[in-house]
Design a protein with these regions (language model features):
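C-terminal motif of bacterial Sec signal peptides marking the signal peptidase cleavage site
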Residues: 16-19
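Short, linear, compositionally biased motifs with a strong N-terminal bias
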Residues: 11-14
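Bacterial N-terminal signal peptides that target proteins for export
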Residues: 1-9
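A beta-strand edge to alpha-helix "cap/lid" segment located at domain peripheries
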Residues: 21-68, 75-236, 246-336
Length: 336
């Protein structure tokens, strides 16, 4: 369902948009306080314009364009749950080859996480092909629901996450693609050749990213959220959610508001018996905003479809509210 992730990465753009205000001049003789200008909030149209520029750069395989507009904390999740950081993403884009006849980006919707962090969701409709994992042209799945998380970095906006789900009818999902044939094993090199070979396998591996200290705490909150969803417990969900919430589910449905999410999660759409949340990896976007990537499973039915054993990869954005972490944004994607 999510093969689009390999060859359509609608990330972010480096265009300057809004600046953090510096201290305002204090000209009042009797005013001893120094005032500061509040950071300028973006608009959905402004962030949509940045994503459009990124789309145009992506289909050209213009990887250099993305080097300055992806945050150093940028991550996407592959269909197998692998975290791809900024370096891996830029490298992947460099190999992209597309033949796009048209693209249409519509339905932009923005949700505030905090004054320096925003979620943007939109619908993308494509007509064309891009090279698949085997290098052969594949029709771009369409339409998809895309989501990007933007953070303010000095005087520009950068992306820290991007994801997309094929928009499908839960009651009539597309048929699963046939399984790929098993790969043939290549003859192994002899020990001497392998030891002397100057290959990537013999070069120093890049430093491995490590989750931050809040990971375990955030996984516990995430699990509590899933358990409250399973139980249709509106009171518990309400206590775990931030003031502003948005969410993209596995069917490409966008829940634009807190009220939408509460209504959907407590409705009769899903009948789930058990849930799990594992493989958590948290990274701080700021002292009060955390991004958690995780693996979830649910045993039951949703939208009339059996989801037992289905692996769901996703990202959640949490904001600090006093001593508690509250859910502000999430995107769940079915494993490929």
């Amino acid at each position: 369902m999510k093969k689009t992730l390999r060859f359509i990465l609608l990330a972010a753009a480096a265009t300057l948009f809004a600046a953090c205000g510096g201290p305002a001049a204090n000209t009042g003789a009797n005013n001893a306080n120094t005032n500061t200008t509040k950071p300028v909030a973006p608009t959905a149209d402004a962030l949509m314009a940045l994503d459009k520029q990124a789309n145009e750069a992506y289909v050209k395989g213009d990887s250099k364009f993305f080097e300055g507009m992806l945050s150093d904390k940028f991550v996407i999740l592959t269909g197998g749950g692998q975290r791809m950081d900024k370096a891996a993403t830029v490298k992947m884009i460099a190999s992209v080859k597309c033949d796009i006849k048209s693209m249409d980006l519509t339905e932009p919707a923005m949700s505030m996480i905090d004054v320096d962090t925003y979620a943007l969701s939109y619908k993308a409709t494509w007509d064309g092909t891009c090279n698949g994992p085997d290098g052969k042209p594949m029709k771009v799945p369409s339409p998809v629901r895309s989501a990007s998380i933007w953070v303010r970095s000095g005087d520009k906006w950068q992306a820290v996450f991007h994801g997309e789900n094929l928009i499908v009818d839960p009651k009539n999902p597309p048929k699963a693609a046939p399984a790929a044939p098993p790969k043939k094993e290549e003859p192994k090199k002899d020990d001497k050749t392998a030891a002397n070979s100057n290959t990537a396998a013999n070069t120093a591996a890049p430093a491995k990213a490590t989750p931050d200290a809040n990971t375990d705490a955030l996984v516990k909150v995430e699990l509590a959220l899933w358990e409250a969803w399973k139980a249709h417990d509106a009171k518990k969900l309400d206590a775990l959610m931030a003031k502003d919430v948005s969410f993209v589910n596995i069917f490409g449905t966008y829940l634009a508001t807190r009220a939408d999410a509460l209504k959907d999660w407590t409705g009769a759409g899903c009948d789930v018996k058990s849930v799990s949340v594992t493989d958590g990896f948290a990274s701080a976007l700021s002292p009060t905003v955390e991004m958690l990537t995780r693996k979830g499973t649910a045993d039951g039915t949703c939208g009339g479809q059996n989801v037992g054993g289905t692996v769901i990869w996703g990202v959640s954005i949490y904001v600090k509210d006093g001593d508690a972490w509250k859910f502000a944004f999430g995107m769940n994607s079915p494993a490929m």
